[in-house]
Amino acid sequence: MQKTPLEKASIFSQIFFSWTKPILWKGYRQRLELSDIYQIHPGDSADNLSERLEREWDREVATSKKNPKLINALKRCFFWKFLFYGILLYLGEVTKAVQPLLLGRIIASYDRDNEHERSIAYYLAIGLCLLFVVRMLLLHPAIFGLHHIGMQMRIAMFSLIYKKTLKLSSKVLDKISTGQLVSLLSNNLNKFDEGLALAHFVWIAPLQVLLLMGLLWDLLQASAFCGLGFLIILSLFQARLGRMMMKYKDKRAGKINERLVITSQIIENIQSVKAYCWENAMEKIIETIRETELKLTRKAAYVRYFNSSAFFFSGFFVVFLSIVPHLLLDGISLRKIFTTISFSIVLRMAVTRQFPWAVQTWYDSLGVINKIQEFLQKEEYKSLEYNLTTTEVAMENVSASWDEGIGEFFEKAKLEVNGGNISNEDPSAFFSNFSLHVAPVLRNINFKIEKGQLLAIAGSTGAGKTSLLMMIMGELEPSAGKIKHSGRISFSPQVSWIMPGTIKENIVFGVSYDQYRYLSVIKACQLEEDISKFPEKDNTVLGEGGITLSGGQRARISLARAVYKDADLYLLDSPFSYLDLFTEKEIFESCVCKLMANKTRILVTSKVEQLKKADKVLILHEGSCYFYGTFSELEDQRPEFSSHLIGFDHFNAERRNSIITETLRRCSIDSDPSAVRNEVKNKSFKQVADFTEKRKSSIINPRKSSRKFSLMQKSQPQMSGIEEEDMPAEQGERKLSLVPESEQGEASLPRSNFLNTGPTFQGRRRQSVLNLMTRTSISQGSNAFATRNASVRKMSVNSYSNSSFDLDIYNRRLSQDSILEVSEEINEEDLKECFLDDTDSQSPTTTWNTYLRFLTAHKNFIFILVFCLVIFFVEVAASSAWLWIIKRNAPAINMTSNENVSEVSDTLSVIVTHTSFYYVFYIYVGVADSLLALGIFRGLPLVHSLISVSKVLHKKMLHAILHAPMSTFNTMRAGRILNRFSKDTAILDDILPLSIFDLTQLVLIVIGAITVVSLLEPYIFLATVPVIVAFILLRSYFLHTSQQLKQLESKARSPIFAHLITSLKGLWTLRAFGRQPYFETLFHKALNLHTANWFLYLSTLRWFQMTIEMIFVIFFIAVSFISIATSGAGEEKVGIVLTLAMNIMNTLQWAVNASIDVDSLMRSVSRIFRFIDLPVEELINENKNKEEQLSEVLIYENDYVKKTQVWPSGGQMTVKNLSANYIDGGNTVLENISFSLSPGQRVGLLGRTGSGKSTLLSAFLRLLSTQGDIQIDGVSWQTIPLQKWRKAFGVIPQKVFIFSGSIRKNLDPYGKWSDEELLKVTEEVGLKLIIDQFPGQLDFVLLDGGCVLSHGHKQLVCLARSVLSKAKILLLDEPSAHLDPITFQIIRKTLKHAFADCTVILSEHRLEAMLECQRFLVIEDNTVRQYDSIQKLVNEKSFFKQAISHSDRLKLFPLHRRNSSKRKSRPQISALQEETEEEVQDTRL
């Protein structure tokens, strides 16, 4: 970044912002990059600002312990500068009130009785022009200074909130949703940036009104208050319209949220949507919601339109009501008329715009400050103190809960019970109504391990394994008992966390660098081969969340980070997730057992082979210690431990049915305490009154729940995953929006708060920060492609040598040469690479083609043109009124002069005769009435048509996205796509229609005023032409740079929130490693990068505003002197010319800003058009109409063979020379694969992590760019439509897709099957008993991706879809990866019966799941080898033989089992299910 010229700029350059000219010229000539942006001033750096505010906040907390106020800390930091710029702003506003006085004196000097003052008219004109210059020199620096202070306040509070976030306790994090936190940083704090300039008008506007009313009293006496009274009534009317608009906005919020939730789910699971051929069904569902949303959008738009148009047309009535009473009583002069008009313009702005906006700004700002103040006082994390004298880790009778403390609970309970009129004397009331709060996650835990021992912790999902580790780290505070441990802790989380940076930086993580230790850890964690394949080895830069890595690679890097740190205690929470058998066994042996042999280790695992090698085994069951001791003691004392470990005693229907009790605990109550109490007390599915009978929603079963139910107030719908309080309309109205353009994976997508589609309960699953920390957000589907497109940075490449583990890597003395501290200073180039951004490279300005496509997108374009002409004629009628006044006023002047009317009290020309007065009065009233009739309603068709255009564009974009090839989604993030449906669609719905209307109206007002001025004084037209030309050239010159600066600001905005989300996901790791200062530095760097862009944008914008005003001042000087020099004795002509010139000056400047805003908003339209123009997959058979497509069955008649045959009939599959890549022309991921499958054959697909198993299944469905040929029952995929081909397959994907909607819709979105058929299939797959428990059964609405269902139940839903499809080929992608044994047995049973005649292709890591397969395909090096039996496979592939356990080998080789039958039998121990990331997501930690 370049050094800012502001530091060396002169006072003149700073006042006129001419120091920005170099960047403006550079942006006009070429494309700007981040390197072209100027460095920030040290006073604007996040470090300095946050330090100042933090110091003052700490002082406030120390001095006001009971009730510290954040606003007091802000005052001490920014008050005096804020006051100084407020005074400048007031002085600038005062000049507006003085200008009409000089205008009146100029008009008066042209009266025939004041000819002696004619000579001073030029001096008065010079004074009037000087007032414009003074106003310009006062207002623009004041506005810029206030924007600057607002920016500094936002930065300081940004940093303060981030620092506080890193200190929050886990209990607090469990109560705060990610959306609330991001909304606090984005929507709320943005109000300071530009809103602060309006804050002073809360006192400036009243003073302005007092001054103006005093001056108007001097002119019109009491009649002046008539106009003021009208303005006050108008303000109240606008306030009423504002409340109506908020009502429509609130109603619309639910529909917008519903649409975005389903849209995000579709985008997130687009591969499943295409595999199921659900594109048309999903499009119909979303368009139905969109129709209801647009009805409310139109109502809100009409109200906003009337609110806006009322301001434009109020000017006539203010002048009319002020002048007419005075005219009727005393008569009036033209000087008074024109002076009153000028005063009324200023008065109208102060009363109807400035003061209400200022009040709203203070209301919003104080609300935000109170929110932040409350946030800063929340409970902080307290690290567990350790005893250096002890050498062991021990727990004595430890209990803990993620809920509130017992004391807090009873205080709240008493308050709630008293509020509900329940007797305090009944102690059972507490436990019957509030049992949810006190259920501990851990109870009476006792164990002790000595230094150097390995403790293995096992248990079922939700047993409390991770909570136990959190308690050792201090994240969970024990409610009873004692914990002892010594020294430093290293931690490997179950959800692998990757920070933005190189692979080496992720592993070293700020610890002193030792090459020998580093290489040893790399080898032990099986990372050598993976790193060697990266283009820059371990210096490859990893993006957000490790998006360029596979799940297994992320898990191994996360483990390597923990192992590299020299600690006294290592906490390893299920570190082997998503690892294949061979890799898992090697890492456990070489790393956990050998490399860390002398360290104290606590390993969470459920593998029996690993339990055997542990020194001690601790088995948890429902939060209690089920067993503690050695493994041999476990076999002797608890031979049935395997079933307890898994969490299911029996596989009978009753036990399977009780699973629903567990899965229904995943909602948090979102209502008032009384609702909570009634919900718990009744223990029933209570519905609200206005439910319809067709749709049901989520339920809450609170019985026996050990999960957290938090009492929360209702929040607004969450938008774009990060906004829970503000709607997109509000977002679009701000010039600055810190909502990230590219959100991070799944965490960025909106979570379902509620769906107003029918019955709903007052419950929802809250996406808390703690949930975010215990889940993964990176889709596994695009790993292979993303790896090949990793952003890299060139650094020195380490040589990897074969390191032995003979030496203890932790006890070596490090030489000075080998120590390398990770620097706290982060280079901006590194920052750009760490936070990968896919922002489009758009042209600096919106092209005319975009405008043309936008206006012609709807058939009502001709009506838009007609109404534009109506607008023009109305403006001409308004301007013509002034000419009528002039023409009819001349006879009146002569009449009063000749008749020497005695009633005249002054010497000025006065309208007093009945003829002249009534004539002019009727003309004015007639013109005003026509303006009211034509003006107020003239824009409605325009607004209506533009909203219809938005509807058409949304429909086209949705269709294009759903039918785009998968290669589009492999190169585009889900967050970017969702932004088009949320942010950009909101702009089209809410802001763009009224912005276009305002711009059209302002331009025509200016044209009308210029026309009148030119007719009166033709010489003025000569001065108007160069002004208009200068305006057009200056606008074009500025737009080239400003739009690029906005793009750069948007790019710089994303890393701020990406870093926040990254920090939240890895917060436990950050605390365990003590790297909070490093991440604060990284956050400040991201803030500074954004500040540099935003400050430069504000500076260039202010330069543009000042330059325009300078041009207008020159124009007004020319108009003034031309009119004075050529007017002779006509005061009326001078008055009209100067009044309209002032009006032109204000209106044209407004129009310039409006044109820039419209151009900026049209960029959203341009982005939508680029999505509409996306390439389309092979088109569906166009000969069929839409109804036939929607109702089409999943079995097709083969038009290519015989009409009487059904295709597919057998399921025979032949693959010939199949090659595949993710994008056209990209690297080949599968090459020349050929094999054939017989009908009904079961085939197992094997391979290491990332070998391409899922890729091959995707290639079968034509989801990739493929070459070669596949035939099913003799029909080639090249001769059949794409959707027909896909419907030949039944699919159970690795990533389960449940969209928000009824169970019926999730099973049969096309509505083809009857209830009897659907219930029969659900019973067949084991879902019937669960569905029967839901109110409404098939009509029960699943929210938030089916949060009330376990992952196993979701798999069964997918299985039911496949059964309904009647497909002949079934593809299963890792179906047992996340399943409990019950669900796995159900799937195996269903495969035997429902798919007995089908060809089954099963992709699995575990050999146990493949025992029933007849053939096997092993993927190695992008090719496939076939094996006829698993025995042959194990014999030829030695690493498979090494990876499987002894018990599995007994299953695979029955001959070996018979030969060893004489040996002493031992209790059979089945392999324990490995916990995975998806299961952890379902636990409440």
Curated annotation (Swiss-Prot):
<feature type="topological domain" description="Extracellular">
    <location>
        <begin position="100"/>
        <end position="123"/>
    </location>
</feature>
<feature type="domain" description="ABC transporter 1">
    <location>
        <begin position="422"/>
        <end position="647"/>
    </location>
</feature>
<feature type="short sequence motif" description="PDZ-binding">
    <location>
        <begin position="1483"/>
        <end position="1485"/>
    </location>
</feature>
<keyword id="KW-0406">Ion transport</keyword>
<feature type="topological domain" description="Extracellular">
    <location>
        <begin position="321"/>
        <end position="340"/>
    </location>
</feature>
<dbReference type="Pfam" id="PF00664">
    <property type="entry name" value="ABC_membrane"/>
</dbReference>
<dbReference type="GO" id="GO:1902476">
    <property type="term" value="P:chloride transmembrane transport"/>
</dbReference>
<dbReference type="InterPro" id="IPR047082">
    <property type="entry name" value="CFTR1_ATP-bd_dom1"/>
</dbReference>
<feature type="domain" description="ABC transporter 2">
    <location>
        <begin position="1213"/>
        <end position="1446"/>
    </location>
</feature>
<keyword id="KW-0967">Endosome</keyword>
<feature type="transmembrane region" description="Helical; Name=7">
    <location>
        <begin position="861"/>
        <end position="881"/>
    </location>
</feature>
<dbReference type="GO" id="GO:0005260">
    <property type="term" value="F:intracellularly ATP-gated chloride channel activity"/>
</dbReference>
<dbReference type="GO" id="GO:0016324">
    <property type="term" value="C:apical plasma membrane"/>
</dbReference>
<feature type="transmembrane region" description="Helical; Name=2">
    <location>
        <begin position="124"/>
        <end position="147"/>
    </location>
</feature>
<feature type="transmembrane region" description="Helical; Name=10">
    <location>
        <begin position="1019"/>
        <end position="1039"/>
    </location>
</feature>
<dbReference type="Pfam" id="PF00005">
    <property type="entry name" value="ABC_tran"/>
</dbReference>
<dbReference type="InterPro" id="IPR009147">
    <property type="entry name" value="CFTR/ABCC7"/>
</dbReference>
<dbReference type="GO" id="GO:0042626">
    <property type="term" value="F:ATPase-coupled transmembrane transporter activity"/>
</dbReference>
<keyword id="KW-0325">Glycoprotein</keyword>
<feature type="region of interest" description="Disordered R region">
    <location>
        <begin position="652"/>
        <end position="833"/>
    </location>
</feature>
<feature type="compositionally biased region" description="Acidic residues">
    <location>
        <begin position="1474"/>
        <end position="1485"/>
    </location>
</feature>
<keyword id="KW-0413">Isomerase</keyword>
<dbReference type="GO" id="GO:0071320">
    <property type="term" value="P:cellular response to cAMP"/>
</dbReference>
<keyword id="KW-0868">Chloride</keyword>
<dbReference type="GO" id="GO:0015106">
    <property type="term" value="F:bicarbonate transmembrane transporter activity"/>
</dbReference>
<feature type="transmembrane region" description="Helical; Name=12">
    <location>
        <begin position="1136"/>
        <end position="1156"/>
    </location>
</feature>
<keyword id="KW-0597">Phosphoprotein</keyword>
<dbReference type="InterPro" id="IPR003593">
    <property type="entry name" value="AAA+_ATPase"/>
</dbReference>
<keyword id="KW-0547">Nucleotide-binding</keyword>
<dbReference type="GO" id="GO:0031901">
    <property type="term" value="C:early endosome membrane"/>
</dbReference>
<dbReference type="GO" id="GO:0016887">
    <property type="term" value="F:ATP hydrolysis activity"/>
</dbReference>
<dbReference type="InterPro" id="IPR025837">
    <property type="entry name" value="CFTR_reg_dom"/>
</dbReference>
<dbReference type="GO" id="GO:0060081">
    <property type="term" value="P:membrane hyperpolarization"/>
</dbReference>
<dbReference type="InterPro" id="IPR003439">
    <property type="entry name" value="ABC_transporter-like_ATP-bd"/>
</dbReference>
<dbReference type="Pfam" id="PF14396">
    <property type="entry name" value="CFTR_R"/>
</dbReference>
<dbReference type="GO" id="GO:0015701">
    <property type="term" value="P:bicarbonate transport"/>
</dbReference>
<comment type="subunit">
    <text>Monomer; does not require oligomerization for channel activity. May form oligomers in the membrane.</text>
</comment>
<keyword id="KW-0067">ATP-binding</keyword>
<dbReference type="GO" id="GO:0048240">
    <property type="term" value="P:sperm capacitation"/>
</dbReference>
<comment type="function">
    <text>Epithelial ion channel that plays an important role in the regulation of epithelial ion and water transport and fluid homeostasis. Mediates the transport of chloride ions across the cell membrane. Possesses an intrinsic ATPase activity and utilizes ATP to gate its channel; the passive flow of anions through the channel is gated by cycles of ATP binding and hydrolysis by the ATP-binding domains. The ion channel is also permeable to HCO(3)(-); selectivity depends on the extracellular chloride concentration.</text>
</comment>
<feature type="transmembrane region" description="Helical; Name=5">
    <location>
        <begin position="300"/>
        <end position="320"/>
    </location>
</feature>
<feature type="binding site">
    <location>
        <begin position="1247"/>
        <end position="1254"/>
    </location>
    <ligand>
        <name>ATP 2</name>
    </ligand>
</feature>
